[in-house]
């Protein structure tokens, strides 16, 4: 049976296990910001809109340089985490708004840069048009380019006979930009994210990943399979192989 959880509830649930901001410079987010600087994109002194900001992994890093940042998201739990971490970091130039991007009303507020990273909030031609209109200077879009493979989850999918979803939204955006005669710059991003989870968190991530397709028999295979992956300390290390593209226009 398909899971009928609405998007807000879905992302509130994801917030329980979702990665959150860290100030380390040895992170994917820090690397992306450095790559953008090398591509002549600076957030320094800019008014930034972060669409689908989630827990604020990018939002807080951008706020270190920007004049102001407004993050939008549909999940109250994601925004709660964002503000917890913003308070710790002393990020008083950051605000948030709980809404879908379709319902977002800037109320006359102007933005220099619109930022959107692997978010379902920006997926359609209307969304592409809108971020373009909202950005006074630049749009920075990070999207999937055909690969998002978790070794842990793919082992579960194989055992359960589940066909993994293909994440590949970048071609749709490129086609739209070409139709609008909008020049853009593209930067490929290939990463392997290594994350270690305690047993409860690993099991929660697996159950979340299969909840739309899992039979009772499949659910029963999760715990034994995780047993085979656990280290001596009971923790499970996962490697996520991803391929994305940054599109800047």
Question: Across the structure, where does each feature detected by a protein language model lie?
Answer:
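Short conserved loop adjoining the S-adenosyl-L-methionine
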Residues: 103-108
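Conserved Class I S-adenosyl-L-methionine
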Residues: 185-249
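Short alpha-helix
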Residues: 166-181
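Class I SAM-dependent methyltransferase SAM/SAH-binding core
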Residues: 55-102
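A short, conserved alpha-helix within the catalytic core of class I
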Residues: 121-134
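Conserved class I S-adenosyl-L-methionine
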Residues: 1-42, 46-54, 140-165
């Amino acid at each position: 049976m398909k899971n009928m959880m609405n998007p807000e509830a879905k992302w509130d649930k994801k917030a329980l296990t979702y990665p959150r901001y860290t100030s380390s410079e040895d992170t994917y987010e820090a690397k992306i910001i450095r790559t953008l600087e090398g591509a002549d994109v600076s957030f320094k002194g800019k008014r930034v809109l972060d669409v689908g900001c989630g827990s604020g992994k990018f939002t807080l890093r951008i706020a270190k340089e920007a004049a102001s940042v407004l993050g939008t998201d549909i999940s109250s739990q994601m925004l709660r985490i964002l503000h917890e971490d913003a308070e710790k970091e002393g990020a008083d130039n950051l605000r948030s708004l709980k809404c879908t991007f379709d319902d977002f009303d800037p109320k006359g507020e102007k933005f220099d840069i619109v930022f959107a990273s692997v978010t379902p909030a920006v997926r359609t031609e209307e969304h592409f048009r809108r971020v373009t209109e909202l950005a006074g200077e630049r749009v920075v879009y990070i999207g999937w380019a055909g690969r998002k493979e978790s070794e842990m989850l793919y082992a579960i999918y194989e055992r359960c006979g589940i066909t993994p979803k293909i994440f590949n939204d970048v071609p749709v955006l490129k086609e739209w930009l070409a139709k609008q005669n909008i020049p853009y710059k593209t930067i490929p991003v290939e990463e392997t994210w290594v994350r270690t989870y305690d047993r409860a968190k690993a099991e929660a991530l697996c159950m979340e990943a299969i909840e739309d397709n899992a039979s009772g028999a499949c659910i029963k295979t999760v715990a034994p399979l995780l047993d085979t992956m656990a280290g001596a300390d009971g923790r499970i290390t996962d490697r996520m192989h991803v391929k994305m593209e940054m599109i800047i226009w």
